[in-house]
């Protein structure tokens, strides 16, 4: 058996296929799906020891499940993290982070360039618990510095952002956060661990919507948080108690997705680059947002921080309405 530190010495492709697979007594080659709500014990003493936490072991699948644990170990290894906690969705991951580290009177600084549901989470729901939120432009470092308060606990960003592919200076934002003992939380859903590892750039926690690229085929909802053991133990406590847990079947789907993640991300990057360059020359396109284009404001930063520019391209047309573009479009 290899420890997780040993596994970090392997290449990403090996980690994506082998990490976390704990075979049962059947000796199966592929990861099994443990579709069970709870677990049985040899005797009452064993049950008491596991329920009390004296002995590690599975109790209830809302807490831990072998298939989910395999996914968590694999994702953590790929992300260069000490630990991962899986959740029922990407928003479940972000909510779990908020519930773990925020209380009444605390303050969050969030990039304006984030997924719409994140804005709703902070403005409509987290605010109900007495947490104040300030939204700032992702690349205005002075705005981030000026927004800091003694009660600031979390800086939250997406990089690349959704949908305009703004690229954050993750190391500098980490420095701003850490100067006042706050945490930098990075949504890495668009890059995945294949293209970017924010923890190595100074982030404290990384969140994922596994629904997107980690699955890659639109089959299941899920999310995850990665980071160090101490922080992830707090997140795990929230997930265990409040219940935004990942299902064993979805975890198995994501395990299969991770196996092909590097190959898929390579193809996504190549296709997006070709599309962005074609759109950039089109006479009816006003502007293209893709960090792979040299004129993109975040191009140099993305080239430095990432191992590819990603698969999301956004663009603005000059005169046609959205309906004139979307109606003739057909899926392949």
Regions found by a protein language model. Give the residues of each.
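Single conserved hydrophobic/aromatic residue that forms the stacking wall/gate
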Residues: 323-324, 328-332
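Adenylate-forming
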Residues: 75, 93, 108, 324-325
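Short hydrophobic/aromatic beta-strand micro-patches
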Residues: 226, 314-316
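Conserved N-terminal alpha-helix of the aminotransferase class I/II PLP-enzyme fold
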Residues: 43-92, 117-124
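Conserved glycine-rich beta-strand-loop-beta hairpin in the small C-terminal domain of fold type I
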Residues: 30, 273, 289-314
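Conserved PLP-enzyme active-site core in the AAT-like
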Residues: 3-8, 16-25, 83-284, 289, ...
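Short, solvent-exposed beta-strand edge segments and adjacent coil->beta transition regions
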Residues: 55, 220, 308-312
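N-terminal "arm"/small-domain region of PLP-dependent enzymes with the aminotransferase-like
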Residues: 2-65, 73
